Amino acid sequence: MLDQETKKKINDLRDTLVGKVPDPKSQVEQIMIALIYKFMNDMDKESTDLGGEASFFVGDFEKYSWDNLFGTKVSGSELVDLYSTAVESMEDNPNIPQLFRDIFKNAYIPYKDAETLRLFLSQIDDFEYSKDSEQLGDAFEHILNSLSSQGDAGQFRTPRHIIDFIVEIVDPKKDETVLDPASGTSGFLISAFKHIVNSNSEKSSGDLLSAAERKKIMKNINGYDISPDMVRIGLANMYLHGFPEPNVVEYDALTSEDRWNEYYDVILANPPFMTPKGGIRPHNKFGVKSNKAEVLFVDYILTHLKPKGRAGIIVPEGIIFQSGKAYKEL
């Protein structure tokens, strides 16, 4: 459970950004990259404090360390230039893992106001990297609450209680593969992992699972999303929930055939059911003839379940009550 002090810190971050970054998704992205930036510096500091060496801010990237952003001789314009350059070039940092490079892919700072940036970074500085992934994950989930309204292409962030309810009903097991073909912020994937861990607990969380079993469970959990921005947010969310190498990729399940032959025991989804003007142009492998997103996603999910597989899908009521041929075929 997230404490009130941490909630206030997160709300203050959004309040600081809202004048320069009014879009909620952009606010989340700015907070996300700043937190990962800060946490990389914290991990470097932890390593050097223990007698080791820094891993992330070394070589050509040493000048971008978090501490250098707060140097007493750094002017406002220098801070904007330093931080902006660091964020935009971080995906090319050879010293950071691929996951972090993916999170920083195409990242940039959409404002140049030094006062706003200095305040924002000082607020980020209050957050510290913790090996307690539950605490970090809960904090990021609170940030993601701002995405609950409709976004591009009919995307919605599914409320946590609905996600958990569906996952509980579908009941994924520790040896089963799980997919969300429209994973967004990765809420279903994280809930599925927590459900499996809790189902294998006796005295403490996941105490009936070996380290190898936990690793396998994480490897079995997969997500696709058509939006590169949502992939980055989903990757960060999973990382902050303890996934060292989350399996979320940019992929359009309705128009690409590259992953058509992949099948899963469990599929969980709340797909974006808004069909673009002119309809979708799907490939020829679908069992129903339609250019409607809701029809195609349901058909995709049913087709990609393994024998005896199970699915939990949030669908518009039209799937049940429409009388068109494609709806009836489903």
List the predicted regions and their residue ranges.
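Gly-rich Lys/Arg/Thr-decorated short loops/hinges at beta-loop-alpha junctions or inter-strand turns
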Residues: 146-147, 278-283
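Conserved S-adenosyl-L-methionine
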Residues: 155-269, 274-276, 285, 291, ...
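Conserved Class I S-adenosyl-L-methionine
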Residues: 323-330
